[in-house]
Amino acid sequence: MIVKFPNQPPELDYGNREYKRLLKLCNRKSFESKATQMLYRIYEGNGHALYLVGIDANGRVTRIKYPELTETIECLREISRIIDATIKKINIYRVDDTSYVSTLRITKEI
């Protein structure tokens, strides 16, 4: 089913929300940088972070193809493993015939 996923407010430098247009499988150094960022968002949310995939930093829905979405989710899984965090819930929204956005709830005991 196609849903209307609204644009979001611009991403803030603080808080537990992180927007990602997409992530490509990348090297260890890049993973470590993203892991530090994820840990920061989790701490800002007292153990909980919300990642929105397919959303630019300005909050606009960018609509990514399904293979890019699954690659981004897999990158986030690997990053969460690095910091011993858990992806608790993944929601995938089809926003048109070929494009998607996703939300991921990530938690860690702090």
Regions found by a protein language model. Give the residues of each.
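Polybasic/polar functional segments that serve as interface/processing modules
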Residues: 1-110
